[in-house]
């Protein structure tokens, strides 16, 4: 209903954020128990747009756990127009680096496990307003790392599109996907691998 309301309110872009995102800027109960996984969120948003004949007219952007070219390919195949990345970009910039492990330990965590980005005490100097911490971020090196990450993600996406016989990543479609488990098939609305069966479709 949220997508329908957004479109009726005049939105020209809808952003769907699945529960697999890396945020810690909320209560634990929200992180663990609120929201739905990203792929079914995409499917439901696309269905809502299609019902209003607004799919591809209103842009659909997907975020929440997008880390690899395969994640992007799945989102585009299900009908998204674009994706947004958050935590993966922070890590590409240099967050969670073992270089700052002692600093992470000093604030009660460890490199690779810290997720309190909202507190402003990021040892890597990325998500902070503290001038001393901010000096730790080398914007040139960080920019190169982020560019490398996005280039690799794009190459993975293009490779998967080619493997599906597509000339462009935006030509990916649900028919290019199968699921490996019944749960994934039901959530994403694609057939279970080796069958034409989509659990829950047509009441079966």
Give the residues covered by each predicted segment.
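Glycine-rich phosphate/ribose-binding loops and adjacent secondary-structure elements
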Residues: 1-130
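C-terminal extensions of enzymes
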Residues: 133-204
